[in-house]
Amino acid sequence: MKRFLLSVLFLYGIVFPACCKTDIYVVAVGISDYKNISDLRLPEQDAKDIAKLYKTKTKHVILLTGRYATKARILQSLRDQFARADEDDMIVFSFSGHGYQGGVCPYDMSRDQSSGITYKEIRSILKQSRAQRKMIFADACFSGGIRGGSSSANINDKDSGVLLFLSSRSGETSIESGMMKNGFFTAYLLRGLRGGADVDRNRVITAKELFSFVHNGVVEKSDGQQHPVMWGRFDDGMVLMDWR
């Protein structure tokens, strides 16, 4: 009788329901050649490499680069992509390009900050998603200005489950190097997510592990000129990448 009952449970998906499979939804943006402001060298490669990494884990990846990364298209992509996520899923917005204190610069950014995309706008879209794990990675100058430049790995914030990992403190630039194919922050972010941050070798990358790896690597590589910051209300053990 017990054997029959167990068979029925498996048959109807009660023991291991398919609905509980975790998926990842990603929007990766990189802008090197801007319409109205100065150009950069590495952001589009940053975005392509982030997208390539996540494509090994999910089919739900949107990549926007150059002239395709307008303000309207970025915001619509975030809304459409993240609305598809379920509660057990994870959503990721990665941006590489120009930034200002409080936001990031789309392709059609002008000298007027109203043409930019504020972190408040981005977080508002993330908060509407059902996903419990929500991440923003931003490799952009002055990105830490959103929170006054704190370097804490777990700053109290009202947006539960939203993790922001930003490449620099307020007032700092995010460094590009001719010796590397990615910006300092994205280079260490990629290394960390690929396994470099897995200090306990359990094939799971947590928020605490990633912050320590990226922060220490970037500070050393930049000779103390750039300090990545992470904040939001989240558990230090929040899983950001699972290679099991």
Ranges and model annotations:
Residues 11-12:
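Repetitive helical segments and hydrophobic/amphipathic motifs
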Residues 3, 7, 16-244:
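Cysteine endopeptidase catalytic domains of the caspase/legumain-like
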